[in-house]
Curated annotation (Swiss-Prot):
<dbReference type="InterPro" id="IPR001892">
    <property type="entry name" value="Ribosomal_uS13"/>
</dbReference>
<dbReference type="GO" id="GO:0000049">
    <property type="term" value="F:tRNA binding"/>
</dbReference>
<keyword id="KW-0694">RNA-binding</keyword>
<dbReference type="InterPro" id="IPR027437">
    <property type="entry name" value="Rbsml_uS13_C"/>
</dbReference>
<dbReference type="Pfam" id="PF00416">
    <property type="entry name" value="Ribosomal_S13"/>
</dbReference>
<protein>
    <recommendedName>
        <fullName>Small ribosomal subunit protein uS13</fullName>
    </recommendedName>
</protein>
<dbReference type="InterPro" id="IPR018269">
    <property type="entry name" value="Ribosomal_uS13_CS"/>
</dbReference>
<comment type="subunit">
    <text>Part of the 30S ribosomal subunit. Forms a loose heterodimer with protein S19. Forms two bridges to the 50S subunit in the 70S ribosome.</text>
</comment>
<dbReference type="GO" id="GO:0006412">
    <property type="term" value="P:translation"/>
</dbReference>
<keyword id="KW-0687">Ribonucleoprotein</keyword>
<dbReference type="GO" id="GO:0019843">
    <property type="term" value="F:rRNA binding"/>
</dbReference>
<dbReference type="InterPro" id="IPR019980">
    <property type="entry name" value="Ribosomal_uS13_bac-type"/>
</dbReference>
<feature type="region of interest" description="Disordered">
    <location>
        <begin position="97"/>
        <end position="122"/>
    </location>
</feature>
<dbReference type="GO" id="GO:0005829">
    <property type="term" value="C:cytosol"/>
</dbReference>
<comment type="similarity">
    <text>Belongs to the universal ribosomal protein uS13 family.</text>
</comment>
<keyword id="KW-0820">tRNA-binding</keyword>
<comment type="function">
    <text>Located at the top of the head of the 30S subunit, it contacts several helices of the 16S rRNA. In the 70S ribosome it contacts the 23S rRNA (bridge B1a) and protein L5 of the 50S subunit (bridge B1b), connecting the 2 subunits; these bridges are implicated in subunit movement. Contacts the tRNAs in the A and P-sites.</text>
</comment>
């Protein structure tokens, strides 16, 4: 089993798809990695040679920020916005949508489960 960036890649999948199991690598990035490493996108993970795995691992280590480093950068960017007190930071702090979406209806993913408010009695 190929282990790259601390992640065990699934054996029976094409390497292009298997690389997307690593946080920070999508389909396009996976294709670029394989092109630079000289590995076919149709190769299955279990049929990779150790040399090919080493090439892929080396390219990712040198050129792409993945997993823990990327997660740390994202959280530091959000923390920086909150410390600045800018609008986006305030929205992060309040747990509301950051990019201008409506909140009168919807926005349940950010706001959490609905809390019913008692209506006015007649």
């Amino acid at each position: 089993m190929a282990r790259i960036a601390g992640i065990d890649l699934p054996r029976n999948k094409r390497i292009e798809i298997a690389l997307t199991y690593i946080y920070g690598i999508g389909r396009t990035t996976a294709q670029k990695i394989l092109a630079e490493s000289g590995v076919s996108v149709d190769t299955r993970t279990d049929s990779l040679t150790e040399a090919e795995v080493a090439k892929i691992r080396e390219f990712i280590d040198k050129n792409i920020k993945v997993e823990g480093d990327l997660r740390r950068d994202v959280s530091m960017n959000i923390k920086r916005l909150m410390d600045l007190g800018c609008y986006r930071g305030l929205r992060h702090r309040k747990g509301l949508p950051v990019r201008g979406q409506r909140t009168k209806t919807n926005a349940r993913t950010r706001k959490g489960p609905a809390r019913t408010v008692a209506g006015k009695k007649k």
